[in-house]
Amino acid sequence: MSESTEAPTPAPGHVREHWNELAEEVRQHQFRYYVRDAPIISDGEFDVLLGELNDLENQYPDLRTPDSPTQLVGGGFSTDFASADHLERMLSLDNVFATDELRTWISRVEQETGPDLHYLCEVKIDGVALNLVYENGRLDRAATRGDGRTGEEVTLNARTIDDIPEKLTGTDEYPIPALLEVRGEVFFRLEDFAALNAALVEEGKAPFANPRNSAAGSLRQKNPAVTARRRLGMICHGLGRSEGFEPVSQYDAYTALAAWGLPVSTHTARVTGADAVVDRVQYWGEHRHDVEHEIDGLVVKVDETSLQRRLGSTSRAPRWAIAYKYPPEEATTKLLDIRVNVGRTGRVTPFAYMEPVTVAGSTVSLATLHNGSEVKRKGVLIGDTVVLRKAGDVIPEVLGPVVDARTGDEYEFVMPTHCPECDTPLAPAKEGDADIRCPNQQYCPAQLRERVFHVAGRGAFDIEVLGYEAATSLLEAKAIGDEGDLFSLTEDDLLKTSLFRTKAGGLSANGRRLLDNLDSAKDKPLWRVLVALSIRHVGPTAARALAGEFGSLARIRESSVEELAAVDGVGGTIAAAVAEWFGVDWHQQIVEKWSAAGVRMEDERDESIPRNLEGLSIVVTGSLETFSRDQAKEAILIRGGKAAGSVSKKTAFVVVGESPGSKHDKAVELGVPVLDEDGFRRLLEGGPDAVAESGV
């Protein structure tokens, strides 16, 4: 009995027509991305279009022609630079977007090769592909990917990148090959990208929207001196043709590249089996912002090169490698309007009101624009298609407009001259301020709502039931006049608002919880009281420093600006803001109301805890077994130390837990002492001398 060999159904006319339109749209976006460095849609939106095209071709295989965008690499090359042929074709990578898709790929690979393979997992750099050719150890030429066979020669520009050696070094184990073709990614380190944009703004020029586009534009400058000033980086991640070297594995290839003086990623891991691969995907999904450059996924490669050869390639991508793509952190959407919000300190902030779009795994329709000057600097108009970015837990940000998408119907935003809530004339707090404020601080309804809501925030009293709706309800029902009345609330007060009243007229469960939470909050430490008072510039860090130095609100109030400014972590601006706040009568009334209601206004110092970390900057990275992140921070602060968020030459110690990320690498690079959890405990108990004695 023979198997059926029935031919696949050809695509109907309307499907073929749709395929043609979609393929042309994808080609245009490829051209704008790879050649012009001026995309008008996000990477995520492009992936959706390409995925739709691929799905059509899977359903109707006769649509999959050799010139389909799904079968080609890159977007060709422009005529601005001389063309350069690659010695071996530069392929792209196929993508997966979910762990079950990744496991399916691994299962398919292991059906052909056998189980429990070794895989090399490395972060996927969001940069620009570059091909380097070395002859007898000297850089001969550099070219962009282009269409995978031919790219643009950018040798002079590549020579200006510090990471790219002009001459290779050799070792006994890895002598220099006669010919070596190396593939890698050119990128911007995030701190260098920020510095570049700051310099462009200072020169009155438009900043770049993102590091990837700026890296592409910088690499393709006609004047190499401009490229040199841009401080690009490069990391190598593969080989093309070579004479005199044949790696046994991907890991072996990377070891050789490093021995020759070529840059390789420190964010790689050689693992066995699907579960370990998925673990790496999840780890870097949580730590993608710990890397010095942008990443948009994890690349998984079969490690053994003999198996790579057995698996082979399609016309566009190797079958032995896959890219797991994380949810895109940038998207394009329509800017429907620009509105303003009045904050708790009176600051009037414009914000973007947009068509909802999914970015970084969540739906976003609002994003801050900071102030009127920032709106002008970004050059956004109402009606623009804009690039939106949301990185992890960071507040969504409008990066700028897609100028090429303008229709002529867009129009400029004008900042209001009067408060939209209380109609008070707006003005900067002082001459030269970029922000404008509503000076009606005590009575402006918007500021009142925001201040009451702020009292309950995680950085302040952390009162769960007191959300924005509750704050609004309490004020509108006149259950409170301002935040000063919160800790005196009674059951009768809460019954004035329907939010805390049952249908039968009694106090709801949430009302009871609010009263209980307010009562518990009265014993919170002094630094939380300081944060809750809505003093300009005083966040948890400055509040902890002030509370640690003075111990009571009375002592802080009585201190001079000079005494306040002398506290480590405070400084002149914060000191002046604190002194100014306590000089306002109605502010004093809030403090008096809270004190009368039983809110603790001073800390009880535990004299048994030594101040043995005075002046030391300590960074904690990774997960500790016996300390939460907040507990570790508190333990450092209570001993007089500073719990820093980044590693520098001034860092005294870096405490490393499980999965520490790039801060550990930075510490090693700078020679900063690294402690494990046991070392951290010794440091807390005995200070720096205790860890010095143990040989750290």
From Swiss-Prot:
Cofactor(s) listed in the protein's UniProt record: Mg(2+); Mn(2+)
GO CC annotation: cytosol
InterPro entries: BRCT_dom, BRCT_dom_sf, DisA/LigA_HHH, DNA_ligase, DNA_ligase_AS, DNA_ligase_CS, DNAligase_adenylation, DNAligase_N
Keyword vocabulary terms for this entry: DNA damage, DNA repair, DNA replication, Ligase, Magnesium, Manganese, Metal-binding, NAD, Zinc
Example GO BP: DNA replication
CDD domains with a match to the protein in the record: LIGANc
Residues where NAD(+) binds: 43-47, 92-93, 122, 145, 185, 301, 325
Residues involved in Zn(2+) binding: 419, 422, 438, 444
EC number in record: 6.5.1.2
Catalyzed chemical reaction(s): NAD(+) + (deoxyribonucleotide)n-3'-hydroxyl + 5'-phospho-(deoxyribonucleotide)m = (deoxyribonucleotide)n+m + AMP + beta-nicotinamide D-nucleotide
DNA damage in keyword set: yes
Signal peptide stretch: none
A Gene Ontology molecular function term of the record: DNA ligase (NAD+) activity
Keyword flag DNA repair: yes
Superkingdom of the organism of origin: Bacteria
PROSITE patterns per record: BRCT (PS50172), DNA_LIGASE_N1 (PS01055), DNA_LIGASE_N2 (PS01056)
Family membership noted in the UniProt record: Belongs to the NAD-dependent DNA ligase family. LigA subfamily.
Cited PANTHER family: CHROMOSOME TRANSMISSION FIDELITY FACTOR 18 (PTHR23389), DNA LIGASE (PTHR23389:SF9)
Biological role: DNA ligase that catalyzes the formation of phosphodiester linkages between 5'-phosphoryl and 3'-hydroxyl groups in double-stranded DNA using NAD as a coenzyme and as the energy source for the reaction. It is essential for DNA replication and repair of damaged DNA.
HAMAP family on file: DNA_ligase_A
UniProt-recorded name of the protein: DNA ligase
Organism of derivation: Rhodococcus jostii (strain RHA1)
Lineage, opening ranks: Bacteria, Bacillati, Actinomycetota, Actinomycetes, Mycobacteriales
Protein's gene: ligA
